[in-house]
């Protein structure tokens, strides 16, 4: 019985990892290049990837994408960005 449970668990894990890999192939690099990751230069919050990442210009002369201290508020602001996540 234990062997069957372990076998089924491995089978489910194999199918899950295959579907995740297929989802990654659906989004080309050009689509993910529309927004910047953490520490990427930015001009507005919409230039940064992720719902909790904001464009921070307070601590230096150049603006960079940083993790927001208020992720819920940032997610609401990001909802109004056009074609960027």
Swiss-Prot record:
One function term, GO molecular function aspect: toxin activity
Signal peptide feature range: 1-16
Listed GO CC annotations: extracellular region; host cell postsynaptic membrane
Keyword S-adenosyl-L-methionine appears in the UniProt entry: no
Domain of life: Eukaryota
Subcellular location: Secreted
Organs and tissues of expression: Expressed by the venom gland.
Propeptide span(s): 17-34, 82-85
Principal cellular location given in the protein's record: secreted
Chain's role: Insecticidal neurotoxin that reversibly inhibits the N-methyl-D-aspartate (NMDA)-subtype of ionotropic glutamate receptor (GRIN) and inhibits inactivation of insect sodium channels (Nav). In vivo, is highly toxic to insects.
Family: Belongs to the neurotoxin 03 (Tx2) family. 05 subfamily.
Free-text note regarding domains: The presence of a 'disulfide through disulfide knot' structurally defines this protein as a knottin.
UniProt name for this protein: U1-ctenitoxin-Pn1a
């Amino acid at each position: 019985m234990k062997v069957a449970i372990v076998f089924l668990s491995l089978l489910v894990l194999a199918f899950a990892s295959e579907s995740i890999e297929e989802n990654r192939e659906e989004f080309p690099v050009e689509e993910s290049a529309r927004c910047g990751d953490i520490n990427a230069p930015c001009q507005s919050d919409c230039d940064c990837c992720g719902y909790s990442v904001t464009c921070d210009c307070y601590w230096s002369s150049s603006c960079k994408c940083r993790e927001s201290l208020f992720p819920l508020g940032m997610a609401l602001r990001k909802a109004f960005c056009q074609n960027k996540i």
